[in-house]
């Protein structure tokens, strides 16, 4: 099974993330940030990646460090669990509706970290959660998972729906991209024979 656990401790946060890429979408999330927990639960459920996240952060300041550092740790865990990436599908893209909102998420598990994020939120906050932190999380995840990730909201009016369509879109794209391709026969999905660089 493709699993990994990452522990990350700084003066600002103490985080432990465990993933099982071949799971069923079971999640156990506790970051102290209700909306963020909801997004990570959606990510696990719709990617079918088992996900445990335990995070303690400096929430008396704001949600920034906890959100970003969780993205770092989760990205590192996914990268570690993928190992050599032999046999994976590698590429995937989805259009994800959430009521009036439609977002497009496309991923390449390339070993080359890139984020293109074209998402606008009509409000600065979703509850107590700063909407600018959605991009911070995606940036941290993409850089540390070493994936090329394009996220774009084509239209939408509700900030909650926009964020949810982005996380669900990533979930479904990840689900497809990390899947083992039975036609690949364990090969690295690159003409170079390796991924990254």
UniProtKB/Swiss-Prot annotation:
Pfam families (alphabetical) = IGPD
Keyword Cytoplasm in the entry? The reply is: yes
Please name the pathway. Amino-acid biosynthesis; L-histidine biosynthesis; L-histidine from 5-phospho-alpha-D-ribose 1-diphosphate: step 6/9
Tell me which EC number(s) this protein carries.
4.2.1.19
UniProt cross-references to Gene3D superfamilies, sorted A to Z: Imidazole glycerol phosphate dehydratase, domain 1 (3.30.230.40)
Record field: catalytic activity: D-erythro-1-(imidazol-4-yl)glycerol 3-phosphate = 3-(imidazol-4-yl)-2-oxopropyl phosphate + H2O
InterPro entries, per this entry? IGPD_sf (IPR038494), ImidazoleglycerolP_deHydtase (IPR000807), ImidazoleglycerP_deHydtase_CS (IPR020565), Ribosomal_Su5_D2-typ_SF (IPR020568)
Q: Does the keyword Glycoprotein apply?
A: no
One GO BP: L-histidine biosynthetic process
Q: Which GO terms describe its cellular component?
A: cytoplasm
Mind listing the UniProt keywords for this protein, alphabetically?
Amino-acid biosynthesis, Cytoplasm, Histidine biosynthesis, Lyase
Q: Name one GO molecular function term.
A: imidazoleglycerol-phosphate dehydratase activity
Q: What is its main location?
A: cytoplasm
Protein localization? Cytoplasm
* PROSITE patterns assigned: IGP_DEHYDRATASE_1 (PS00954), IGP_DEHYDRATASE_2 (PS00955)
Q: Which domain of life is it from?
A: Bacteria
What SUPFAM superfamilies does the record tag this protein with? Ribosomal protein S5 domain 2-like
* Family according to the record: Belongs to the imidazoleglycerol-phosphate dehydratase family.
Q: What is this protein called?
A: Imidazoleglycerol-phosphate dehydratase
Task: Please name the source species.
Answer: Bradyrhizobium diazoefficiens (strain JCM 10833 / BCRC 13528 / IAM 13628 / NBRC 14792 / USDA 110)
What is the name of the gene encoding this protein? hisB
